[in-house]
């Protein structure tokens, strides 16, 4: 027989590299990194976040539900879904920890979207939560500026603009 060949080694995906950089930066400034389930229940994805029953994010056309409606709870809304954000990890963490809280929760999220240049039914997201005494919007701004300058370049200019996103 012929001698064996050296196995071809792949490369890490660019999004994996960026995610690791994001996690490393936040760890360096004292944040804990949380990983959580991609299959989520209605409570952690919507209810515990005070999203009302008629919130647009709960619609079947926006959320990828996985099971039949929960008849036992007398609702027509299914109870298991692919998470639409990583906020469920914040709820899980706060159920078992008291402030101060300094966490980020990166991960894949899913939404019923028609793929185009700016939309995908599956994408990466990072959410952060900082809770403690004397935390202000200045802390948010400083954290974001520190993160972006470390990720991109120290000369990166950061501008924050208030906006409204009906999904969130």
Regions found by a protein language model. Give the residues of each.
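TRNA-recognition modules of translation machinery and tRNA-sensing kinases, especially anticodon-binding
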Residues: 1-168
């Amino acid at each position: 027989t012929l001698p064996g060949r050296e196995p071809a080694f792949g490369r890490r995906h660019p999004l994996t590299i960026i995610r690791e950089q994001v996690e490393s930066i936040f760890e360096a400034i004292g944040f804990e990194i949380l990983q959580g389930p991609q299959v989520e229940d209605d409570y952690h994805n919507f209810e515990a976040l005070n999203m009302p029953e008629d919130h647009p994010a709960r619609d079947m056309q926006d959320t990828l539900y996985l099971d039949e409606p929960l008849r036992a709870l007398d609702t027509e809304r299914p109870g298991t879904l692919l998470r639409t954000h990583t906020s469920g990890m914040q709820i899980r963490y706060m159920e078992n920890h008291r402030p101060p809280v300094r966490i980020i929760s990166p991960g894949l999220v899913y939404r019923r979207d028609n793929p185009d240049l700016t939309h995908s039914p599956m994408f990466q997201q990072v959410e952060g939560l900082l809770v403690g005494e004397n935390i202000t919007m200045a802390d948010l701004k400083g954290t974001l500026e520190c993160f972006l300058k470390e990720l991109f370049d120290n000369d990166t200019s950061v501008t924050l603009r208030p906006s409204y996103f009906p999904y969130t």
